[in-house]
């Protein structure tokens, strides 16, 4: 009985941070306002090498929310309501000529998901998630028509998560695997990853690893200056630090980078945020 109670308590604690095999409890929720930034003058080319590009920056302000409709069924929304993509001015030393910079701002591609708990209230919990990616962003914008706040394709992803708590230690691990069906001649993707987290009362550090592998079965053009491209691949570890201010409110920060990739910026991705638990 004590073990079951501990498992329930640690699962409720982990649920509030989203992701993993735990659905939200009925009428429970997790809502987060985040600011994300990535800027780079380096790019992972299609062959995996790192090449120089004109400096590009992407700023994303977003809302992420999870709400438990039942003890097994959770609704999830990711809405980047303000995305700004910029391209630096280029100045040629020999001629003195310049190419002006460029900027684009709009909303971004939005994800709507349903998660269902297949196995709950056990040391190992398993859930399945169906995600719909709505192409609300701009795939070709700015005066240069090369800036983006989205990829312009409607995707559907099916993902399975499994999580395990190491009773009596406040440690958990999670792993997932998913298939992402992309439209508009974009290649489909296989995605998988893992994370390990500690629930140290108010301080919750989480280490994540995400991997995206293209199936190379689409012929859409590959972007050469951002993250919204066909045949994007990467292996990316991320460290996330969460701090509980009280029972409901908390703050978080994270930093991640791709140590291998294709068709994606070759620089760290930074994020800060504040969250509310119901």
What are these regions (language model features)?
Residues 28-29, 147-224:
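Detector for outer-membrane/organellar transmembrane beta-barrel domains
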Residues 29, 59-63, 108-112, 154-160, ...:
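Hydrophobic, lipid-facing positions within transmembrane beta-strands of outer-membrane proteins
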Residues 35-41, 79-85, 118, 132-138, ...:
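Transmembrane beta-strands of outer-membrane beta-barrel pores
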Residues 72-77, 122-126, 169-173, 202-207, ...:
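Repeated loop/turn-to-beta-strand initiation elements of outer-membrane beta-barrel proteins
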Residues 195-278:
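Outer membrane beta-barrel transmembrane domains
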């Amino acid at each position: 009985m004590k073990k079951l109670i501990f498992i329930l308590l640690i699962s409720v604690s982990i649920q509030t941070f989203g992701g993993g095999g735990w659905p939200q409890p009925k009428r429970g929720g997790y809502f987060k306002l985040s600011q994300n930034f990535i800027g780079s003058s380096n790019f992972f080319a299609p062959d995996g090498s790192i090449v120089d590009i004109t400096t590009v920056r992407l700023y994303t302000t977003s809302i992420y929310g999870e709400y438990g409709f039942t003890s097994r069924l959770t609704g999830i929304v990711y809405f980047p309501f303000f995305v700004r993509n910029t391209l630096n001015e280029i100045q040629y030393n020999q001629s003195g000529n310049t190419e002006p910079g460029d900027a684009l701002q709009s909303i971004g591609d939005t994800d709507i998901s349903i998660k269902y708990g297949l196995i709950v209230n056990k040391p190992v919990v398993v859930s399945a998630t169906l995600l719909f990616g709505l192409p609300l962003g701009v795939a070709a914008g700015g005066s240069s028509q090369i800036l983006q706040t989205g990829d312009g394709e409607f995707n559907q992803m099916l993902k399975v998560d499994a999580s395990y708590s190491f009773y009596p230690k406040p440690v958990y691990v999670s792993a997932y695997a998913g298939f992402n069906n992309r439209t508009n001649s974009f290649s489909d993707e296989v995605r998988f990853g893992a994370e390990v987290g500690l629930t140290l009362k108010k301080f919750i550090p989480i280490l994540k690893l995400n991997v995206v592998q293209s199936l190379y079965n689409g012929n859409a053009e590959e972007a050469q200056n951002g993250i919204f491209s066909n045949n994007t691949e990467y292996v990316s570890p991320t460290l996330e630090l969460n701090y509980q201010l009280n029972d409901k409110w908390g703050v978080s920060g994270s930093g991640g980078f791709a140590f291998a990739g294709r068709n994606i910026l070759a620089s760290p991705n930074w994020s800060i945020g504040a969250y509310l638990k119901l």
